[in-house]
A protein has these predicted regions:
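Peptidyl-prolyl cis-trans isomerase
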Residues: 1-179
Length: 179
């Protein structure tokens, strides 16, 4: 009954303004524990004829070059993703490299991280478009978590309201028994 009650009444629309308001009033809750990054990642074979071209192009800020990179990379790379407009946790990126994030960050030179796994024929590389190492996490990084927090608070309020209403109804109808 409780689940049905909640699903029928829970307002799941969370506006950007509500997220921003919560973020601004709870910034201490969003202090970074690890760096967050915007990156372009590629896993390419060391002997690929396009390797150097792909590595050069993932670091390009030119829109035309970037689109060419997408098509060349898709055909040349074992794995590729573009998170240049989305913040990601450094630990998640480090997992792509198969190392911990401090090892990964120590391999960064001129915003490029390159790691050649031992015993494999590939090269893992990421171009770091932006990085925040400390301070308050960017709102965009926290938005999904804040949305969950706000929905959870609404759900909790609904459950409390249901419990209060049931208790009041039971007391009014003298159906409340204490054992």
């Amino acid at each position: 009954y409780e689940q049905r009650y909640i699903s029928d009444r829970l307002d799941t629309l969370v506006t950007d303004a509500q997220i921003s308001e919560y973020y601004m009033s709870h910034q201490d809750d969003f202090v970074l524990q690890r760096p967050v990054m915007k990156v372009r990642f590629v896993d390419v074979m060391k002997d690929s004829p396009n390797k150097d071209h792909v590595l050069k192009m993932i670091s390009s800020d030119e829109f035309d070059e970037f689109h060419r990179t997408d098509s060349i990379t898709v055909s040349s790379a074992l794995r590729y993703f573009d998170n240049s407009d989305v913040w990601m946790d450094a630990r998640d990126l480090a997992a792509e490299f198969g190392v911990d994030y401090s090892q990964m960050l120590s391999a960064m030179k001129d915003n490029m991280i390159k790691i050649e796994p031992e015993g494999r024929g590939d090269l893992l590389a990421a171009y770091v478009c932006d990085i925040r190492r400390s301070g308050v996490a960017p709102l965009e990084f926290c938005a999904a978590e804040i949305r969950d927090i706000l929905l959870s608070a609404r759900k909790h309020a609904l459950v409390k309201g249901l419990e209060r209403d049931l208790l009041e109804t039971a007391l009014e109808n003298r159906q409340f028994v204490i054992y």
